[in-house]
Amino acid sequence: MENISVNNLVEEFESSLPREISISIAKNILNSKISKENAISEYKKNIGLLEKKIQRQVINCTGTLLHTNLGRAQINPRFTGGASNIEYDLDQHKRGERNEYLTSSMNLLLNSENVCFVNNNAAALFITLSTVKNSSNIKNVIISRGEIIEIGGSYRLPEIIESSGLKLQEVGTTNKTDIKDYEKALKSNPDSILLKVHRSNFSIKGFTKEVSIKELKTLSTKYKAHLFHDLGSGLVIDRNFLEAKEIDIFNSEPTVQESLEDGSDLVMFSGDKLFGSVQSGIIAGKENLVKEIKNDPLFRTYRCSPLILFELQNTVNKYIDKNEMSIPIWSSLLMKYEELLARVDDISKKISIDHKIFDSESLIGGGTMPDKKLLTPAIGIPSKNIDEDLRILSNQEIPLIPRISEDKIIIDVRSCPVEDDEKIIELLNKL
């Protein structure tokens, strides 16, 4: 049998991978001394698998708006590279304060004294606890047993607290915690902080009781203890805006502004959930506490890149300008049923495969408000071979990610912008 070389493999079969990676794959296969036919097949298989691992744009038709596996909040990126004035004062022509405008505009939006930005909300909580431990001789974190959470990716709150060097002290029970439970713990351990954690990815109903931030503030003032609120989902939108849109699903979801107004010393939340921006953790609240965090040696290891800060700035500006509908998560959440039906009808008329339009339910996702669902028209496509249809939809320059229900491919367009509709039509017609 004719021998096959590395160059034969690399040059005969095109790949979007860098040439050196393709060469490395070819060498590994040929070194295994398999037959020519098997070498070609194995090379194409390995190249194809690796190409699918490359991070790229996809079309989210799952109906989950903040899909954790698809990057949570969609953004409209504006900064495309090059130098930026991240730490340069254009007025004084010298080094300036990092993200000075973003800090002041975020303070304006949240009505906070100071704010800082880190990689994600887990980092925000960790560095907050670590800093107060080192600067204030704090030893314990008092928290309701019903708020000891776990979120996706094996994030467990007790492990974060333990890693910070503080000791977790549970109070109350899973379903009921009273102010007296917190007070008893504070009396026994005055070197403690109070931490309230928003249960954003699950709910407890029935015979329940929890203590509000206002009640905890009275207690923390009495015992001179810090009060922190891990809000997670990061709702900052104006209640008046939601009322004008006749949206009531967020009535029980606290906003960052409300938490600060009710007395939280610091509030931590994610940038890529209901805030609607890039992955980041935002810490807002008292001037002195945020300043201590910024001065902590660990802060530099967690601080955000210029690209992240630029996109956060872009999102904050939209909130301040009352231009919430230009933030993708809010345009998706608030899109009316009639608008979605018009999109679905248009797609339906332009695809040739067997399908049916039906009423479905979209999810907010991202570990946010799991019991809230949005009525949404969707397209159901019967499939004789789900795996093959998924392979076709994913083996594209811009893959389409649908939802699978029983033996049907479900296309829910609430989770993708209207600009994706023509591409959706093109890809569905390949099935």
Region locations from a protein language model:
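Conserved PLP-dependent catalytic core of the aminotransferase class-I/II
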Residues: 143-144, 150, 308-309, 313-365
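Conserved C-terminal alpha-helix-loop-beta "cap" of PLP-dependent enzymes
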Residues: 341-419
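Short Gly/Ser/Thr- and Asp/Glu-enriched loop/turn motifs at secondary-structure junctions
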Residues: 4, 59-63, 122, 274-278, ...
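Glycine-rich phosphate-binding segment of PLP-dependent enzymes
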Residues: 26-27, 31, 61-62, 71-93
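Long amphipathic alpha-helical segments
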Residues: 1-48
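Conserved PLP-enzyme active-site core in the AAT-like
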Residues: 94-316
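N-terminal glycine-rich anion-binding loops that anchor highly charged ligand groups
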Residues: 15-31, 57, 190-192, 318-319, ...
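Long amphipathic N-terminal alpha/beta scaffold segment
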Residues: 36-75, 104
